[in-house]
Amino acid sequence: MPMYGDLGNKLVQHAKRTQNLSHLPPYQTELVRAVAREIRDLDKDVASLLEPFQGSFDPSAEQATACTLLVNHLSMRRNKRCLLAYHRIRTDKLEELVWNGADILDLAGQTTGGPKGVTEGNEGGGTTSSLSPQEEDYFRQFGDLLALYKGQWTDIDLTGSLEPPRDLFIDVRVLKDAGEIQTEYGAINLTKNSQFYVRQGDVERLIVQGYLQKLG
């Protein structure tokens, strides 16, 4: 039999797994709604228990009722903390992806479908965006804010790696088509599965974005 807080605990487990992933898994819409619905139901139960006392409730005289109220209150509080933790982890991941130069179209295009793609809170076939509408809006606005901040220092890449490259030139494999890019030594057409020996500074951003894989 499900207990209070079980759904919130599932959200925390999703958040914990998200911390160890390089991408953002699908937003658990139905699970979030279920936790919020449980909070509302508990709040209604609390109001119903207190209604007969008309503001004169004495916990010492009504210990059984006081115990029930305490359990309901702690359950609501825990559920709220689970919701906050889940959304905080996803927000941190979104901001990290913005700093790494991820594209909103790539994130929104991550889909789940079929038996292996079904996740709790997103049952059913078909395709589902990895981001909620609110997350897509936050991603865009944070990206705009970062672009405005970076615009003050046009000669410095504030999103670049803090570690200097060990090798000036590296071998890379193209993981997905990226089109033509201009480098210091000319244009390169990046087509899937092709390999190049290039200056690391020219392709570092594409490596971070997942278009290229560094070899060796």
From Swiss-Prot:
It comes from the Eukaryota. It is found in: Nucleus. Gene3D superfamilies: 1.20.58.1030. Its main location: nucleus. SUPFAM superfamilies: GINS helical bundle-like. InterPro entries: GINS_A, GINS_bundle-like_dom_sf, GINS_Psf1, PSF1_C. Pfam families: PSF1_C, Sld5. One of its GO terms (cellular component) is GINS complex. The GINS complex plays an essential role in the initiation of DNA replication. Belongs to the GINS1/PSF1 family. This is DNA replication complex GINS protein psf1.
